[in-house]
């Protein structure tokens, strides 16, 4: 008897896949990799850019890769991407970021990670001229509003982000589903064969030091952290602050004010995973001074490496980090200073936070995030 069961065809916009997409790239990589392992029934079409096309590999024979070498956020994305999508005869499309083409030709799901460009708009967050920034920000608001309105389901990475979406866009809470991100199995990262001392020396780092890993966008509040560190450094001359992140306009902007710190503030730039594990392992604490986060994955990854976390108490961070962090108000320099000094000096507190961190990260699984996302796909497809 012939089996006429319909095979669904699902597309995923994975142009941010992997390191080129930074934190968003990690989310997309884990979601795509896990979903195509979990679902051996549906067909998947994965849209990639030239830079990451060869990086994505799958043993699932029902997965097809499509080259969509289209820049993010531009006019070409709005015109060419719908054309590529329409050629694939998809039943459903997943956009893991807000940048959904206005004329998307198929039903879709969208993941919203935060509303930072609405809630935290600032000219300092861009290299664009003021007029161009205002125009792009205006169109951003249109694109995200239409994406949320037209999506069959909106995925949010935290309850905080869900509530922000519901309030901002006046939509029903049931249209937004929370799918927490996961924490990668950091043990799988390659360990550098060199001695830890050699790695620290390579980056001009001496112990003890505080660590931050991530970008330097204004909402990350690294300028505030540097000001607080200058107060601590006046009392603890042997302490360093290490700010790890690929050098760009935002990191370069931080350098002139720290020129007089005599090597106390280090900018290693991009650090490969093997070296980064050692930087995590030897640090005194991980400092997360952000003013706005939709989820806060970097702090969870620090916990996974066994590092105590001292964190801002803003937005989603208390929800995500729970009781496994020492919190401060990032707009109160005296409070930030006191909490950092506390984690430096109190060995019992450090051990307690490390142990709490190991327990906290068990709440977050990429496979569970993928499973919940797949459930959303299937629920929508059953109604089509």
Regions found by a protein language model. Give the residues of each.
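Carbohydrate transferase catalytic cores enriched for Leloir-type hexosyltransferases
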Residues: 2-384
């Amino acid at each position: 008897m012939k089996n006429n069961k319909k095979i669904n065809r699902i597309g995923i916009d994975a142009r941010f896949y992997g390191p080129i997409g930074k934190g968003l790239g990690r989310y997309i990589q884990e979601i795509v990799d896990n979903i195509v392992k979990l679902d051996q029934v549906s067909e998947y079409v994965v849209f990639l850019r030239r830079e990451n096309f060869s990086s994505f590999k799958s043993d699932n024979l029902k997965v097809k890769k499509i080259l969509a070498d289209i820049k993010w956020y531009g006019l070409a994305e709005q015109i060419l991407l719908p054309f590529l999508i329409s050629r694939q005869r998809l039943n459903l499309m997943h956009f893991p970021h807000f940048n959904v083409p206005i004329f998307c030709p198929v039903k879709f799901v969208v993941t919203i990670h935060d509303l930072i460009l609405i809630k935290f708009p600032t000219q300092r967050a861009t290299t664009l001229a003021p007029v161009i920034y205002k125009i792009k920000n205006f169109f951003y608001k249109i694109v995200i509003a239409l994406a949320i309105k037209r999506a069959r389901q909106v995925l949010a990475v935290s309850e905080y982000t869900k509530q922000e979406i519901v309030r901002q866009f006046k939509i029903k809470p049931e249209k937004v589903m929370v799918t927490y991100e996961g924490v990668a199995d950091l043990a799988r990262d390659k360990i550098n064969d060199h001695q830890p001392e050699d790695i620290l020396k390579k980056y001009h780092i001496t112990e003890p030091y505080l660590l931050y890993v991530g970008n330097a966008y204004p909402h990350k509040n690294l300028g505030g952290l540097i000001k607080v560190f200058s107060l601590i450094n006046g009392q603890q001359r042997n302490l360093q602050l290490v700010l790890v992140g690929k050098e760009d306009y935002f990191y370069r902007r931080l350098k002139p004010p720290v020129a007089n710190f005599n090597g106390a503030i280090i900018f290693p730039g991009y650090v490969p995973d093997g070296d980064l594990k050692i930087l995590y392992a030897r640090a005194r604490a991980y400092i997360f001074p952000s003013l706005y986060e939709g989820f806060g994955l970097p702090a969870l990854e620090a916990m996974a490496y066994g590092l105590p976390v001292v964190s801002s108490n803003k937005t989603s961070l208390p929800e995500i980090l729970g009781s496994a962090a020492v919190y401060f108000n990032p707009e109160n320099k005296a409070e930030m200073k006191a909490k950092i000094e506390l984690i430096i000096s109190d060995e019992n507190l450090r051990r307690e936070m490390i142990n709490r961190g190991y327990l906290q990260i068990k709440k977050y699984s990429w496979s569970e995030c993928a499973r919940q996302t797949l459930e959303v796909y299937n629920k929508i497809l059953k109604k089509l």
